[in-house]
Regions:
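Flexible, glycine-rich beta-alpha linker
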Residues: 111-113, 136, 160-184, 208-209
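Conserved Rossmann-fold NAD(P)-dependent oxidoreductase catalytic core, especially the SDR/UDP-sugar
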Residues: 89-134, 160
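Short-chain dehydrogenase/reductase
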Residues: 81, 85, 133-145, 175-183, ...
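C-terminal substrate-binding subdomain of Rossmann-fold SDR/epimerase-dehydratase oxidoreductases
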Residues: 10-15, 19-27, 191-275
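Active-site Tyr-X1-5-Lys
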Residues: 132-165, 184-195
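Conserved catalytic-site region of short-chain dehydrogenase/reductase
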Residues: 70, 105-120, 136-142, 154, ...
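Adenosine-cofactor binding site in Rossmann-like domains, unifying the SAM/SAH pocket
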Residues: 25-50
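NAD(P)H-binding glycine-rich loop region in Rossmannoid oxidoreductase-like domains
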Residues: 45-85, 97, 114
């Protein structure tokens, strides 16, 4: 891979995509291509086909997705399933048909069974049932993983899937209706402090365990995948260390300086016990 290779990063303005862009720029890659959603609707197959024909990228990195936390996944299952399948299918199939030989697909640890043994291993994929609160997103992502595997198997192309653990970083989503747990907690404790609210109520029991990874650190794995011909079709990306949601909440509360109490709404779902 030469530094002048044309690399298209789908979702380049998001938390993950922008981290990858920064990582590649810092390594001297000078021919990066990105499009905003207003410039290129990735759900539109013809638009994606036309884009590939015009730009002719040598490598595609798919960091584009419709994402959200438990609440958003629960409320909009059809959108999370169909929009993600449209986005990734158009990108993967379009890249293959356009002659792209290297494709890096970014997924999520939610593709693994709800009660998969720990630590999560790639071989656990499709061995048991998924967590119901995000199965629609997970099914879409599994489809992307298997599409890349199929192209790899049938056409011997370097189509690889990277499954990061729970990510946080710059340009994260802090909308309480659609965000993931860490940014949601940051906002709740911050607003409680500035509004002088003594208590913060959080979802679930606080007992589930989560592993977290800074998006810019995850981006280094994408650079590695770009610069090396990896022998397998699927790789997990993480730190190997996790914390309980309760520990996360207490850490965020301490850092922000909120002095009140934390209450847990056990009627709300916990999600996967550990991932």
């Amino acid at each position: 891979m030469v530094k002048s290779s044309k690399i298209y990063i789908a979702g380049h303005l998001g938390m993950v995509g922008s981290a990858i862009w920064r990582a590649l720029e810092s390594k001297g890659y000078s021919n990066l291509v990105g499009r905003t959603s207003s410039e290129l609707d990735l759900r539109n197959q013809q638009a994606v086909t036309n884009f590939y024909k015009k730009e002719q990228p040598e490598v595609v990195i798919d960091a584009a997705a419709k994402v959200g936390g438990i609440l958003a996944n629960n409320n909009f299952p059809y959108q999370f399933l169909m929009e993600n399948m449209l986005i990734q299918n158009n990108l993967i199939d379009g890249a293959h048909k356009a002659g792209v030989d290297k494709f890096i697909f970014l997924g999520s640890s939610c593709i693994y069974p709800k009660f998969a043994p720990q630590p999560l291993k790639e071989e656990y994929l499709l061995t048991d049932s998924l967590e119901p609160t995000n199965e629609w997103y997970a099914i879409a992502k599994i489809t992307g993983v298997k599409a890349c595997q199929a192209i790899r198997k049938q056409y011997n192309k370097e189509y690889v899937s990277l499954m990061p653990t729970n990510l946080y970083g710059y340009f994260d989503n802090f909308d309480l209706q659609s965000s993931h747990v860490l940014p949601a907690m940051l906002r709740k404790f911050h607003e409680a402090k500035i509004n002088k609210h003594s208590d913060v109520t959080l979802w679930g029991s606080g007992t589930p365990m989560r592993e977290f990874l800074f998006a810019d650190d995850m981006a280094e794995s994408v650079v590695y995948a770009l610069e090396n011909n990896l022998p397998e079709f699927l790789y997990n990306i993480g730190t190997g260390k996790d914390v309980t949601i309760k520990e996360l909440a207490e850490t965020i509360q301490k850092v922000i300086g909120h002095k009140g109490q934390i209450f847990w709404d056990a009627e709300k779902p916990d999600g996967t016990p550990r991932k």
